[in-house]
């Protein structure tokens, strides 16, 4: 198997792990995914005009800060979260690309969707660079007030 095919297979495994994780049950499962798939010296750019997150430990901390409120709203407030991805064929063969959508739905039926694209570079079967771009948002904001 050539290097590009191996990276593509690793990317498929990572994407499948992300979509299988259940935020209502645990946010820690996402941190375990970081441990399993990301290099110690990973660099992640979460959007334009944002400082890169450098290192697996910082990525774990950043991810936990983001996921804990979502986990609480899902576990206690009835927030439903679904995550989907579509692989994007790479033109250069060096990176992997995918398009993601996370849909948040509260019990009243209010829904908000977030979309973004991801570019990854792999080294030794670990992500060592990831960039999120082309962010899109649809639907009204969801906050704790909407659960009343």
Give residue ranges: language-model regions.
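Short, ordered coil/turn segments that flank beta-strands lining enzyme active or ligand-binding pockets
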Residues: 40, 107, 123
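Short Pro/Gly-enriched beta-strand edge/turn motifs at strand-loop
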Residues: 97-103
């Amino acid at each position: 198997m050539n290097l590009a095919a191996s990276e593509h297979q690793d990317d498929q495994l990572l994407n499948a792990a992300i979509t299988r994780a259940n935020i209502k049950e645990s946010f820690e499962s996402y941190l375990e995914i970081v441990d399993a798939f990301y290099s110690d010296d990973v660099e992640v750019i979460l959007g334009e005009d944002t400082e890169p997150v450098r290192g697996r430990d910082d990525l774990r901390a950043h991810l936990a800060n983001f996921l804990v409120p979502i986990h609480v709203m899902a576990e206690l407030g009835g927030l439903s979260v679904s995550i989907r991805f579509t692989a994007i064929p790479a033109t250069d063969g060096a990176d992997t690309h995918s398009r993601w959508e996370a849909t948040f739905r509260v019990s009243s039926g209010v829904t908000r969707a977030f979309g973004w694209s991801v570019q990854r570079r792999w080294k030794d079967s670990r992500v060592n660079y990831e960039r999120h771009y082309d962010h899109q948002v649809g639907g009204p904001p969801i906050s704790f007030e909407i659960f009343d």
